[in-house]
Amino acid sequence: MAVRIHFTDDDLAQIRLAQAPDPMWEALLSMHMLQTDTASLVFGSWRNVVRHQLTRPTGELLRLAPPVGYSADFLTPAAGAGGLDAGIGALLSTPRQRLGHDLDELARAGRRLPSWARLLADGDKGAVTHLGRLHRHYFATALAPWWNRVRTRFDAERATHTRYLADGGLGGLLNTLHAGIAWRRPVLEITGLGIDRDVHLDGRGLLVLPSYFCWRHPTLLKDPTLPYVVVYPMAHETALSTAPGLRSLNALLGRTRAEILETVADGGVTTTELAHGTGVAAATASHHVGVLRKAGLLTTCRTGRAVLHTVTPLGLALLDGRA
């Protein structure tokens, strides 16, 4: 199964790489991570701090963003690209029809909604204001103290893919975003989402958005009529911890190879970037990549002047089983 995004010539001229992290998307996806215990290597310390500090009323916001399945589309308005104030302003201006539609979607999925959800679905001004207040408090608690780190990683990710665009054109950009994203002009195919769908942009263009809190697989809005965005996990510079699952992966692959597999899973990288990220010599990184490639966990391809390593479905399955 795959989501196939079909481009017209007009769409191809309107593919954009986001200029800055989107606080609304980071809020939504961090809510997902807060409700799981996966990816402790990257998010474990953050999760422990935020769970301790988050107030119960603000925690009700998480009911609109379950970690599996549908989350309310209205939580990530396109205006979030302009910053937190713009995003919350758009959230407060969400049409009543959109609020009702998205909350009905959650209810049909059997989600337990906050006590104020019915008022929100009716467009009650007090409930909408309450939603905006909770969202702002959530950002202040869960994201603001870490926002410089999010921005630094975003800038590095954007610089990397800007280089791929310059070296390999549109294919150089789209084919290096994530192992589950493939560009076969004029169709962008995204796998690993558990859905099968064809989306025709019809001149709307596409925003490509790296996300710090997006984990393992890309994500999309459910409603294909909204401004279209593909959100994908940005690369993380991580240090291995002593988490039980991670110790098992270390025992299976070895510490350095496990770290290389983790790094490559977040997006295509070069041998030099792997060497820098893992603290080993380029020749050593190249050797480990060769071993992982022979095991079917990684693949290597040339895009423009860059030779990129990406994780295979088998490699992702191994990591998913470990997470």
Specify the residue positions occupied by each region the protein language model found.
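Generic preference for flexible, low-structure residues
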Residues: 43, 66, 104, 147, ...
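Long, low-complexity, charge-rich intrinsically disordered regions
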Residues: 55-57, 62-63, 75-77, 192-235
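N-terminal, charged low-complexity regulatory/assembly segments
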Residues: 1-190
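A generic short-segment signal for beta-strand/edge and adjacent turn/coil regions
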Residues: 150-152, 173-179, 196-202, 276-279
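Extended mid-to-C-terminal alpha-helical interaction segments
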Residues: 207-323
